Amino acid sequence: MTAQQTPSGTMRQVVVSAERIDVVGADVPRPGVGEVLVRSVLAGVCGSDTHAAAGLHPWISLPYVPGHEVVGVVSEVGAGVPSLEPGRRVTVEPSLPCWNCKQCLRGQQNICENLGFLGCGDPQGAMADYFTVDARRVHVVPDELDDRAAALIEPLSTPVHALRLADGVSGRTVAILGAGSIGLLLLRAALSQGPKRVVVTAPRAERRELALALGADAAVDAYADDAVEQVRAALGESADVVFDCVASEATTRQAIGMADKGGTVVVVGVPSGEIQLPLQLVQDRQIRIQGSATYLPEDVADSIELLTSGVVRPGDFVTSVVPMEGVAEAFEQAASPQHIKVLIAIDGPADPDRAG
């Protein structure tokens, strides 16, 4: 089937249930007014996917259809979509705003009061042969990016947004807590802004070594009793900005402890439960705690630029590509420390010359 043909009948779709992950049959959805039908090519397994599969995600209930990091091809367009045509290679913003609430009208669709999310509790997800989505959430992938690079646009947009909320890090000292895919993507994005120094914390030695290879000035064992002191020593001072990509109680305390007076702690990770804050330190040191939720279109545009310019290279992050039939194995790989970014091959490459 070519991208220009209209599919019909049934398709494959991944469903994550308690203690199992299956590929099941489902009807091919039809695009409504203002929507496009996308044929999935590659879908990334996110940390939120593995946490949800383990029953640890606060906002995703089982069973659910996963997949929000995706590169695909427009297969069909609904009425009222003049700007896209079948055959275009695309990625999507998976957040699904109402467009009418106070936050949406302010241009903050990422924190819409009625937000849905493709692949995170929505009836559809990108780990399927096809899915429909609002055409306003679709971004055309430039020809310079191969499919693997395009699959990183969505996850890279999360740290790009966090950097924006921190008012950038040029000339500032930075601590990044966590060296998973988001923490390491954040490292590369931060380095592009010219920080004074960047230190990464991670419990596993191989992740600390990887952070150093990707440009960190130092890497500290997150489990060390004196981790906060080590970060300060490596920075030469307390951190102007701390990005917590783990969001556990331990990292929250570390982040506040290593932040400079008047500094900023950006919460990038998704906490799995309630966390107690050392609020007396926050007040006394005038520390700003800044939440960071997904991203906006300008962050997607910046992510595309970071990838096209080579600041972020897919070869540094994509460690496995698994066929759709091996989705359970892909989730196991993504949850293991041996892998950074695991992709699921839903279909053949969008363009064989750009398969990556």
State what each model feature region is.
Residues 98-177, 315:
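NAD(P)H dinucleotide-binding glycine-rich loop of Rossmann-like/cofactor-binding domains
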Residues 29-43, 56-102, 142-144:
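Glycine-rich beta-strand-centered segment in the early N-terminal region that forms part
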Residues 13, 69, 88-89, 103, ...:
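Residue-level marker of beta-strand positions
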Residues 1-9, 253-257, 297-356:
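C-terminal hydrophobic helical "lid"/dimerization subdomain
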Residues 145-224:
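Mid-domain Rossmann-like dinucleotide-binding core that forms the NAD(H)/NADP(H) cofactor-binding site
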Residues 166, 210-288, 328, 351-353:
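Glycine-rich cofactor phosphate-binding loops and adjacent beta1-alpha1 units
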Residues 203-204, 271, 295:
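Residues in the short beta-alpha loop(s) of Rossmann-like NAD(P)-binding domains
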